[in-house]
């Protein structure tokens, strides 16, 4: 069973669901529950003819407490949170300052989720849209010039989880998030992630970390910044802003699950852009806590609502079994280095429905992820001669 809320997708394994349901025999007389006469209780599969008005049924009993407990752990635990509060002001230097975090609260209605699950299972459906109550944060904008330009309330939130990241990747994500904190997006302007990000290198505080470079995964300055661009993208995409430019990664990366919600960048060539067509300017607050990253967009909400549906996935391909090898003079002769993991391929599509007043528009986001083999580089002598196989250290 799959549970969805916005871009979040949760799965409950079949073996867990099996324990939720038991079956029992029930008897009724003209629609009322009865205890059947002893003569009608028989061993085996054959039941004697029933008197008029008496019916025998097999009914399902659902263990709602067990279901609620499972959904609490799998769904509510990662989603539920309390609403925050923030005071937005300007410092003496004119810089925008945030005191607090205007993150909205969420509560999964577990009782309603259990009932929806029962209906879905009894009807043979495999997906439940979670009933989630949202709680608005308290936002105080002290600076009058910001209020005059429409900075009044929370408009959109982008979030992602980078659990399992390396130390350098976590560092780069933190540095990248700070570049956008306090960034102001005028009304009717086009926001460019790459332009706002600026230079990426050791002088701007970044470390080398794995980055997708063509058909390889190699260390480069700023590895992990796609976590920041993906977080920024999810917020405006889910809020219904027009997306001008967005590209998925060439292969599926688990940090950006569910697939089809990522936005890769590689300055200066690959960017993420959107148009602020809202009721006023937008102001960004960025934040990270633990392994979660957030983009909060403050502004003035208009009458638009947005709904995202997906992902629809197909063309699932296993990773190639053969190992890809490339010979290079960048490594010492005989040195062996892994530059690509085995990755399965797939295609994914999301639909977005944006409603304004009496009208609505539907757009789709398509992503194609390559299936990739295990990939090694092997060092060769500068003459270009390839070393014999027995001269290569397989443990390197």
Positions of the model-derived regions?
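Well-ordered beta-sheet/strand-loop patches within structured domains
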Residues: 2-11, 15-50, 61, 65-396
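Noncatalytic, helix-rich "gating/capping" subdomain that lines the substrate-entry/channel surface
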Residues: 53-54
């Amino acid at each position: 069973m799959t549970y969805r809320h916005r871009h979040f997708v949760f799965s409950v394994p079949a073996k867990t669901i099996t324990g939720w349901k038991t079956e029992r025999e029930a008897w009724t007389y003209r629609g009322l529950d009865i205890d059947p006469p002893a003569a009608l209780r028989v061993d085996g599969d054959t039941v004697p003819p029933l008197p008029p008005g008496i019916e025998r049924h097999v009914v399902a009993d659902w263990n709602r407490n067990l279901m609620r407990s499972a959904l609490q752990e799998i769904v509510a635990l990662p989603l539920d949170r309390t609403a925050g509060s923030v005071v937005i002001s300007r410092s003496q230097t004119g810089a925008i300052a945030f005191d607090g975090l205007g993150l909205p609260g969420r509560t999964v209605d577990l009782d309603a989720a259990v009932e929806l699950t029962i209906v879905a299972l009894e009807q043979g459906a495999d997906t439940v849209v979670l009933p989630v109550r949202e709680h608005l944060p308290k936002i105080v904008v002290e600076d009058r010039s910001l209020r005059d330009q429409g900075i009044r309330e929370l408009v959109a939130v982008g979030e992602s989880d980078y659990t399992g990241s390396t130390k350098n990747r976590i560092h780069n994500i933190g540095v990248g998030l700070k570049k956008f904190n306090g960034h102001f997006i005028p009304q009717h302007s086009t926001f460019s992630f790459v332009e706002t990000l600026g230079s990426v290198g050791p002088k701007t505080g970044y470390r080398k970390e794995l980055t997708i470079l063509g058909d390889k995964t190699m260390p480069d300055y700023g590895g992990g910044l796609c976590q920041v661009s993906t977080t920024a993208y999810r917020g405006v995409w889910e809020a219904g802003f027009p997306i001008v430019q967005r590209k998925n990664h060439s292969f599926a990366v688990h940090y950006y699950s569910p697939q089809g919600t990522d936005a890769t960048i590689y300055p200066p060539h690959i960017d993420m852009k959107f148009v602020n067509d809202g009721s006023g300017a937008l102001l960004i607050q960025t934040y990270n806590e633990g392994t979660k990253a957030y983009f909060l967009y403050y502004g003035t909400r208009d009458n638009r609502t947005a709904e995202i549906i997906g992902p629809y996935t197909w063309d699932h391909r296993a990773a190639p079994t053969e190992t890809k090898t490339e010979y290079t003079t960048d490594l010492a002769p005989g040195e062996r280095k892994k530059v690509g993991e085995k990755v399965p391929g797939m295609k994914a599509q999301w639909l977005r429905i944006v409603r304004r007043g009496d009208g609505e528009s539907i757009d789709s986001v398509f992503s194609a992820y390559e299936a990739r083999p295990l990939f090694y580089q092997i060092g060769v002598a500068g003459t270009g001669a390839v070393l014999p196989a027995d001269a290569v250290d397989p443990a390197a």
